[in-house]
A protein has these predicted regions:
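Conserved donor-binding/catalytic loop of nucleotide-activated donor transferases
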Residues: 113, 249-251, 267-276, 296
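Donor-nucleotide binding loops and adjacent catalytic segments primarily
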Residues: 40, 45, 172-254, 286-291, ...
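Acidic donor-binding loop of glycosyltransferase active sites
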Residues: 92-94, 249-264, 271-272
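Active-site-proximal region of nucleotide-activated glycan assembly enzymes
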Residues: 31, 41, 52, 111-170
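Conserved nucleotide-sugar phosphate-binding/catalytic loop shared by glycosyltransferases and other
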Residues: 3-7, 30-75, 220, 305
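A short, well-ordered alpha-helix in the C-terminal region of glycosyltransferases
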Residues: 325-339
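C-terminal alpha-helical cap of glycosyltransferases
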Residues: 338-359
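Glycosyltransferases and closely related glycan-assembly transferases
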Residues: 82-95, 103-118, 131-135
Length: 359
């Protein structure tokens, strides 16, 4: 069996695709091929997992009418031709789109070649690419029930977000490797300047018995490193965390954006969190994600307009100093966790491809 996956841009699109690819590779010994762009994190994350990847030229249109959109339109045309060539040569039994602009050309070309198609939408409110593709793909795997408001229900299957299986598998015995309270700070795979700026001030007078692992994002790392030297001994600064399963398991509290995959992994691991949703996203979907956890008593939410080093520190210490509240939030997060999404998407894909699964 051959499966082609299209995903690009940030880890939030790429990691779910990798989780799905592993299901097909492990259960069917399927031959896997990725399509991406050379500008996104797929150049690193996909190859790190040992999967082959081919690249096409594609970019997203600007919201305002600008001359640059003509260049992007030409790139899109070239991207469709490039994706079509890759698909004809690879001859997949199934094509799966997991988000990012690269999904459009790949899934569209597969449809034109009568190859079964499936897309996965990570957020409550689908992006433009998903809305367009949903008109002709065979199935749309969704992560939230509310997404049915935007896509024809006959096309959708509620699966949740595919997350790294190791997030769930880490046992309670493996979780605590530190004596003091531990905080994980992640601003997304590319980084979040506002979170980094706030943390740069916060760590200057943070209590010495609180251990902090702070992932700045690759494009922010060097700047943050220069601004915060010398760092307190209990603060570990890194550009990116590859073993996120271990990092989340080892934390008492996670400070993060509220992207769909981040939220899904926090819930699956059963961790209390302080969520700082990005306002710079379509339909403000991150705040929607964050508020869903807040309503269930699983997270504290701080919007950017409210964020200050003092407010974040007070919120954090309030949680760390109250173990009962921390444990309650952890239990509530765990209840919200949906696991088995990659397995379910694998089963849907097998049915679309007209094949029986090995399980």
């Amino acid at each position: 069996m051959k499966v082609l996956l299209a995903a690009g841009g940030t880890a939030g699109h790429i990691n779910p695709a990798i989780a799905i690819a592993k299901q097909f590779a492990e259960k069917e010994h399927a031959e896997i091929q990725f399509i991406g762009t050379k500008r996104g994190m797929e150049t690193e994350l996909v190859t790190r997992e040992g999967f082959p990847i081919s690249y096409i030229e594609v970019a997203g249109f600007k919201r305002k009418l600008t001359p640059e959109n003509f260049k992007i339109a030409w790139q899109a045309f070239r991207g469709v031709r490039q994706a079509g060539k890759i698909i004809r040569e690879f001859r997949p039994d199934l094509v799966v789109g997991c988000g990012g602009y690269v999904s459009g050309p790949a899934v569209f070309c597969a449809h034109l070649q009568n190859i079964p198609t499936l897309i996965h939408e990570q957020n409550v409110i689908p992006g433009l690419t998903t809305k367009i593709l949903s008109k002709f793909v065979d199935k749309v795997a969704i992560s939230f029930e509310d997404t049915n408001q935007y896509i024809a229900k006959k096309k959708t299957v509620l699966t949740g977000n595919p997350i790294r299986e190791t997030i769930v598998k880490v046992s309670a015995a493996e979780q605590k490797t530190h004596e003091h309270p531990s905080v994980l700070v992640v601003g997304g795979s590319l980084g979040a300047k506002v979170i980094n700026d706030t943390m740069a001030e916060l760590v200057k007078d943070m209590e010495t018995d609180v251990e902090i692992v702070w992932a700045t994002g690759k494009r922010e790392y060097e700047d943050v490193k220069k601004r915060t030297q010398p760092l307190p001994e209990q603060v570990k600064l890194v550009p990116y965390i590859y073993d996120m399963d271990k990092a989340i398991a080892d934390a008492d509290v996670v400070i993060a954006r509220a992207g769909a995959i981040t939220v899904s992994e926090i819930c699956a691991a059963g961790k209390a969190s302080v969520l700082i949703p990005s306002p710079n996203v379509t339909h403000n979907h991150q705040e929607y994600n964050a508020r869903a956890l807040e309503k269930k008593g699983a997270a504290k939410v701080i919007c950017e307009r409210e964020l200050t080093p003092r407010y974040l520190k007070e919120t954090l210490l309030e949680l760390l100093m109250n173990r009962e509240t921390l444990q309650t939030m952890s239990r509530n997060a765990k209840k919200m966790g949906i696991v088995g999404a990659a397995q379910q998407i694998y089963e849907i894909g097998m049915r679309l491809a007209g094949k029986s699964s090995s399980e």
